[in-house]
């Protein structure tokens, strides 16, 4: 086979894709990751590497970047091939093989394909306030890549979901002052997080303003002011700030995957209980899939990855059983 061939090709090198690769490797098959981001980890690396994750079994809490580091180390003994900075564009059938071409013009073949592309292509949801785009990268942020960026700064956080509430709490030990505004009195974040947020507000460790929205951002070479307003009375407040963190969610889309001939439902890939898609030999797992009872949780993504990987392995090599046996009875390479 040519050097661009592996037994299994995995579209996506986020946490679910990495764990799928681990299981493919445990079955003795070769595999390649194709991902448009420059490094593994998906959203965990690109959007919130220093955010704690609390719902991974065995970890009371773990930084996103540390979870990715562990997953990369876990899969490393199986010699994965990484094709990073490449977006999977097309999927074609060539005899018994699948051929995936990428945005870099490369073509990779495999006996089976696993799609673990997370939410698909994503970009931050901008709110359209005057000065927002002007100061992007100069005080306006849509993600926290490093908490150190906010050390000693006066930070305005805009949003009412998990990311906004979690970062308001996570930056308490870093920022000089935190103000969180949300356009509604109710928050969409997890109840326990909201309770902790309001406790911090009552204790004077941060300020919460509802129902407030961002009117405009002002400054010179960097952000200096943010004008917010009460959306019922229109009363304005001018806040001296060093950073505006807009966490209003992300706009997601399947991108080229939408043209692969897969059965879709509400911009998600439909799978059965084996994580098989409507195309034989193509499996999917993680946030990109839908099935009755599906929940978008990382811990479920890991389980789906194991199912997809073992069925893909058996498809790629019919001599293999789907059931992999217990990992405790085996030893990974290098152990």
UniProtKB/Swiss-Prot annotation:
Any one Gene Ontology molecular-function term assigned to this protein's record: ferredoxin-NADP+ reductase activity
Origin superkingdom: Bacteria
Required co-factors: FAD
Catalyses which reaction(s): 2 reduced [2Fe-2S]-[ferredoxin] + NADP(+) + H(+) = 2 oxidized [2Fe-2S]-[ferredoxin] + NADPH
Similarity comment: Belongs to the ferredoxin--NADP reductase type 2 family.
Name of the protein in question: Ferredoxin--NADP reductase
Binding site for FAD: 16, 35, 43, 48, 88, 122, 287, 328
Keyword Oxidoreductase appears in the UniProt entry: yes
EC numbers, comma separated: 1.18.1.2
Keywords linked to the UniProt accession: FAD, Flavoprotein, NADP, Oxidoreductase
Cofactor binding summary note: Binds 1 FAD per subunit.
Subunit structure: Homodimer.
